[in-house]
UniProtKB/Swiss-Prot annotation:
Protein name (database record): Protein-export protein SecB
Species of origin: Pseudomonas fluorescens (strain Pf0-1)
Gene, per the UniProt record: secB
Source organism superkingdom: Bacteria
Location of this chain's protein in the cell: Cytoplasm
Gene Ontology cellular component list: cytoplasm
Keyword field: Chaperone, Cytoplasm, Protein transport, Translocation, Transport
GO-annotated biological processes: protein folding; protein tetramerization; protein transport
GO molecular function: unfolded protein binding
InterPro entries: SecB, SecB-like_sf
Coiled coil regions in record: none
Self-association and partners: Homotetramer, a dimer of dimers. One homotetramer interacts with 1 SecA dimer.
Annotated disulfide bonds: none
Function according to Swiss-Prot or TrEMBL: One of the proteins required for the normal export of preproteins out of the cell cytoplasm. It is a molecular chaperone that binds to a subset of precursor proteins, maintaining them in a translocation-competent state. It also specifically binds to its receptor SecA.
């Protein structure tokens, strides 16, 4: 019985573990440089989305992942608004090989954070009295694969700061 308990405990210690600890807004900004005049114009928006992720090792097996979404919306040639959110999360991640850890931090965690960031941006934009901002889902696995390929071609290796 004791051998079975020791084996189970040993397997539990080496089994991959993933746990979301906390999701929070790290930074938030909104600018509407042409208000109130922009509200009196015909609305024909052009949306430009920039996104970025970064990871940081914390103490032990904890990691912070930050997803930054920056949106610039132009109405004709004028900037209607600029909104940015840094949506962050703290994750407990244990017992993953280097490739799995890189994928988890570079694609899986940002995928978890995106709906929160999208909702925060939408709320911010509507509070600025603009129409709702409905951002399409993002394929973080594809973005991660592209970044991996770019890094391999340039001889870089993925790192966690």
């Amino acid at each position: 019985m004791t051998d079975q308990q020791n084996t189970a405990a040993s397997e539990e210690e080496t089994a991959p573990q993933f746990s979301l600890q906390r999701i929070y807004v790290r930074d938030l900004s909104f600018e509407a440089p042409k208000s109130p005049a922009i509200f009196r114009q015909q609305w024909d928006p052009a949306v430009a989305l920039d996104l970025n992720t970064r990871q940081k090792a914390l103490e032990g097996d904890f990691y912070e992942v930050v997803l930054t979404l920056s949106v610039t919306v132009k109405n004709g040639e004028e900037v209607a608004f600029i909104a940015e959110v840094q949506q962050a999360g703290i994750f407990l991640i244990k017992n993953l090989d280097a490739a799995s850890m890189s994928h988890t931090l570079g694609a899986f965690c940002p995928n978890i954070l995106f709906p929160y960031a999208r909702e925060t941006l939408d709320s911010l934009v509507t509070r600025g009295s603009f129409p709702a901002l409905m951002l399409a889902p993002v394929n973080f696995d594809a973005l991660y694969a592209q970044e991996l390929q770019r890094m391999q071609e340039s001889g870089e290796t993925p790192t966690v700061q």
